[in-house]
Amino acid sequence: MDSRIPYDDYPVVFLPAYENPPAWIPPHERVHHPDYNNELTQFLPRTITLKKPPGAQLGFNIRGGKASQLGIFISKVIPDSDAHRAGLQEGDQVLAVNDVDFQDIEHSKAVEILKTAREISMRVRFFPYNYHRQKERTVH
């Protein structure tokens, strides 16, 4: 039995836009050159944990949702908030909150989950490419 997966069954994966290094930087100097950052760890998923006292604000806004087909994104982080100190940033895609998948969720449901939770464990990834595409499509 052939265990290979047909090409059309592979998921579509969107990667951040890649910019080639400037031609004037010699290839052997590109790794550590200050004008070229090839560090991609900023795009890896990470977990943000927040505790919210009753009546307190989260310190960030979201936009998007199922209607945009691109997910929920952080659209604003209030400076010096707990969310800011935890490393949340504009352009982060919210993958899950408290083990609830946020990749195909209605905006209103996402807001409800975030507002009612006292402890929030968010799985996010920095995804500026889809964030900008999502901003162009929605008004949230």
Curated annotation (Swiss-Prot):
Where do the PDZ domain residues begin and end? 47-129
Where does the record place a coiled coil? none
What keywords were assigned to this record? Cell junction, Cell membrane, Cytoplasm, Membrane, Secreted
Tissue specificity: Widely expressed (at protein level).
Query: Which Pfam families is this protein grouped with?
Result: PDZ
What's a single GO MF annotation on this record? protein-macromolecule adaptor activity
- Entry's Gene Ontology cellular component terms: adherens junction; basolateral plasma membrane; cell-cell junction; cytosol; extracellular region; pore complex; presynapse
The cross-references to InterPro entries, in alphabetical order and at most eight, read:
MAM_complex_regulator, PDZ, PDZ_sf
UniProt record, GO biological process: neurotransmitter secretion; pore complex assembly; regulation of synaptic assembly at neuromuscular junction; synaptic vesicle transport
Q: What PROSITE patterns would the database entry show? A: PDZ
Q: Sorted alphabetically, which SMART domains does this protein's record hold?
A: PDZ
Q: How does it assemble?
A: Interacts with ATP2B1, ATP2B2, ATP2B3, ATP2B4 and ATP7A. Interacts with PLEKHA7 (via WW domains) at zonula adherens; this interaction is essential for the interaction between PLEKHA7 and the ADAM10-binding protein TSPAN33. Interacts with SLC5A6.
Task: Quote the function comment for this protein.
Answer: Mediates docking of ADAM10 to zonula adherens by interacting with PLEKHA7 which is required for PLEKHA7 to interact with the ADAM10-binding protein TSPAN33.
- The identity of this protein, by name, is PDZ domain-containing protein 11
Read off the lineage from the record: Eukaryota, Metazoa, Chordata, Craniata, Vertebrata
